[in-house]
Amino acid sequence: MLYLPPYIGAFGEGGDTYVNGPSMENRGVEILLTYRNSLPSGFNYSITGNIATFKNKITELPDNVRSVYGGNGMLDDIIGRPRNSIYGYVADGIFKTQEEVDNSPQQAGKGLGRIRYKDLDGDGRITQDYDRTWIGVSDPDFTYGLNLQASYKNVDLALFFQGVHGGDVWDSWIEYSDFWNIQNVNNTNHLKGVFNAWSPQNPDSNIPALSTRNTNDEKRTSTYFLKDGSYLKLRTIELGYTFPESMVKKAMISRLRAYVSANNCLLYTSPSPRDYAASR
């Protein structure tokens, strides 16, 4: 793969030079099956399903692009992992009591109602070098689709379902639904989830306390923002009617079909009701 590294502005327009990036191994498979049948009554239908999966991993990583592809820049790098791996902190709930704050590892900005991060190396401090790890992969486990078609006499119906299973998605809506301190406070609307934020009167909440300051750096890449990207969507539904040839022939039309269709009709995701299809 090629990579375009940043360059000093004084170099001018000729400073943008592509360099060789990592080497990657890709493997995948797709299966598509179709079944068609016609009944004596004149009812015809077909069912087509497909499923696909792919895996990739970085096999070689030149030193000059090592810091671009995640890891801590030392021993922990992306080699042997998927290209779209996510590197960050492991969120461990929020501080709900002063005792939890006092007995936790050193963490700049910690306090009641703030996100707590795991001390992965056990040294009693939350640091960028030793307390980040590989926390997810945005690639789905597999994708699938289902196409249903049926017709009876002059009426036809078609439905197309499409879905994704697995894969971690960065839910940017959380920046507005759970926080007041990591977006523009004065000029940005926020979702009503902020009304359920932690407070001494609401001590069981898992949403960070409202604040106009971000001393705990809570916009950092962490598992707090990662959600399961699985979904199933009814992409298209179409109902049509083909006019009899005897009717349209008088108007010198060989074939006339009228139809109504709708797109993105139904969506199923779990546990969040948000549509993660646009986040991929």
What are these regions (language model features)?
Residues 1-13, 45-52, 56:
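Membrane-embedded beta-barrel scaffold of Gram-negative outer-membrane proteins
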Residues 13-15, 25-29, 51-57, 139-144, ...:
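Transmembrane beta-barrel architecture of outer-membrane proteins
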Residues 19-25, 29, 36-138, 178, ...:
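Conserved small-residue
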Residues 33, 47-49, 159, 258-260:
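Membrane-embedded beta-strand positions of outer-membrane beta-barrel proteins
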Residues 35-37, 51-57, 152-154, 163-167, ...:
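Transmembrane beta-strands of outer-membrane beta-barrel pores
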Residues 41, 154-159, 246-247:
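Repeated loop/turn-to-beta-strand initiation elements of outer-membrane beta-barrel proteins
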Residues 164-257:
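Extracytoplasmic gating/loop element in the C-terminal half of outer-membrane beta-barrel translocons
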Residues 268-275:
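Conserved small/polar residues in nucleotide/adenosyl-binding loops
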